């Protein structure tokens, strides 16, 4: 399999280039990521992310089911945050603002330590995987939001020029 470089691909593919520093064996100080979603969507997002950029550390998932005890799930999120926090902060990503996963995550926000980013999508995750080793929490969360918005498109409008 040939690896393509950003210069060889059209558009702004730099957002999708894997960061291979993770595989060099060093323990990195980085922003932790916790994916909290309805059902098992969080696990699938993690699998898709790792398919695109390779294995990731300091990432956890929490699935919220319709019959789950909310206090138990809140504690699961709290434990996941503690597990991925290396001191650079944690971004909790949720699938939909106002939904149960988002509301539980918001109850755990801490200024400059734990932030919640709702509207999870794959471009957002890929961007965060790229920037979380070298960015401050506040910067990374905005970059993730920007990437998530940037890649929402109506194909026919783009192709029509």
Language-model segments: which ranges?
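N-terminal loops that bind phosphate or other acidic moieties
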Residues: 4, 19-161
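Cationic, low-complexity basic patches in intrinsically disordered or flexible, solvent-exposed regions
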Residues: 9, 18
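Intrinsic low-complexity, disordered N-terminal segments enriched in polar/charged/small residues
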Residues: 13-15
